[in-house]
Curated annotation (Swiss-Prot):
GO terms for cellular component: mitochondrial inner membrane; respiratory chain complex I. InterPro entries: NADH_UbQ_FeS_4_mit-like, NDUFS4-like_sf. Its main location: mitochondrion. This is NADH dehydrogenase [ubiquinone] iron-sulfur protein 4, mitochondrial. Signal peptide: none annotated. GO terms for biological process: brain development; electron transport chain; mitochondrial respiratory chain complex I assembly; proton transmembrane transport; reactive oxygen species metabolic process; response to cAMP. The lineage of its organism: Eukaryota, Metazoa, Chordata, Craniata, Vertebrata. It holds the Pfam family NDUS4. The keyword Transport applies.
Amino acid sequence: MAAVSMSVALKQALWGRRAAAVGAVSVSKVPTRLLSTSTWRLAQDQTQDTQLIAVDEKLDITTLTGVPEEHIKTRKVRIFVPARNNMQSGVNNTKKWKMEFDTRERWENPLMGWSSTADPLSNLVLTFSTKEDAVAFAEKNGWSFDVEERKVPKPKSKSYGANFSWNKRTRVSTK
């Protein structure tokens, strides 16, 4: 019965109410969904789909994640904004706050010589849009944290006329 009503609902969505009337089962209670591709409707659907779900109480999910309890309860995280890449002039990756975990014991793998660790969270980096979100997430999980404040670079004041000055270091002879 579920497969029949499912196909009728699909017919109704694709062909409208006329095709549903032809079907054997009446589906007057099934809501119709418009298959419109207008950008306004897509934007409305997207805002409805991206509502945040807030869970106030602290949930113990250690049995679900598979991470040992010693790696969850005794963690220290560092919350920071990454520095700008010196090889590029853009500042795109400096707007998000990142959270990374402290390093635990590592050893050298005797077979291959690779660095090994028993810590599943050692290479995990979490990204947040605000510092408050990162701090709230660390507190919710019971981790101690250090926050490194954002370093705002001071702009150097330069005048355009200094580019054409005669006694610039590039024009002064060194011999």
